[in-house]
Amino acid sequence: MSELPADQGVPPAGAANDNGDVRQAEVGGRRREPAPAQPVAARDRPMAAAVEGSMASPVEGPVPEAREGPMAASREGLGAAAREARMAEVARLLAEPAEEEGPEGRPRSRPGNGPGLAALPYLRLRHPLGVLGINYQQFLRHYLEHYPIAPGRIQELEGRRRRFVEACRAREAAFDAEYQRNPQRMDFDILTFSITLTASEIINPLIEELGCDKFISRE
């Protein structure tokens, strides 16, 4: 075997490390080409796929399905209970009588009797006591039976109302008759009454509020 030339020996390690372009020499003068460097992304791709697979595996399992099952069942149960409550309320309203007796004993018409509103029980007008589940006629009968003074009080109020209505009608008839006899006199009386009413209700309180009544003679 021939001896290797001195200039083709193996270079020192320091020189190879300092200059990256210098290729390492082999025996026989042949130079070895460096292996192609793999990209960083190609090296990291298998590791990233393994990490993603390990993270995605517990989520895709049967755990979410088992977790969503009780929640869906509870929501369905609440919806069914609400529907049953609404149906019970509608049935209770439909079971109520369509007519009620008024204070005079004659039936009281209700808007729910019409064909158009028969299917809408919530639009029927109800007595305030009906909201509390109290029948108005039974409540009134119980009140009249246990409080003997109530019938007398009611009759007294009815008498006062009747007398007031009769007096108003009599005054209206007298006013019409007087106007037919002397229209000019009635017009003057109406004007005088209007001025007097305005002075008593507006002008006099304003004078007292401003303090001008001290300078006005009260004679």
From Swiss-Prot:
GO MF assignments: transcription corepressor activity
Q: Where in the cell is it found?
A: Nucleus
Task: Give GO BP annotations, semicolon-separated.
Answer: cell differentiation; muscle organ development; negative regulation of DNA-templated transcription
Q: Which residues carry this modification: Omega-N-methylarginine?
A: R75
One GO cellular component, as annotated: nucleoplasm
Listed transmembrane segments: none
Q: Where is this region: Disordered?
A: 1-71, 95-115
Q: Which key words tag this protein in UniProt?
A: Developmental protein, Differentiation, Methylation, Myogenesis, Nucleus, Repressor, Transcription, Transcription regulation
Q: Where is the composition biased (Basic and acidic residues)?
A: 20-34
In its keyword annotation, does this UniProt entry include Repressor?
Answer: yes
Q: Does the keyword Transcription apply?
A: yes
Q: What does this protein do?
A: Interacts with EP300 and acts as a repressor of MYOD-dependent transcription and muscle differentiation. Inhibits EP300 histone acetyltransferase activity. Acts as a repressor of TGFB/SMAD transcriptional responses. May act as a repressor of the TGFB/SMAD3-dependent signaling by selectively blocking formation of TGFB-induced SMAD3-SMAD4 complex.
> Can you quote the domain comment?
The N-terminal portion of EID2 is required for nuclear localization.
Subunit structure, briefly? Heterodimer with EID2B. Interacts with the C-terminus of EP300. Interacts with HDAC1 and HDAC2. Interacts with SMAD2, SMAD4 and with the MH2 domain of SMAD3.
> What is this protein called in UniProt?
EP300-interacting inhibitor of differentiation 2
Record organism: Bos taurus (Bovine)
Which gene is annotated as encoding this protein in its UniProt record?
Answer: EID2
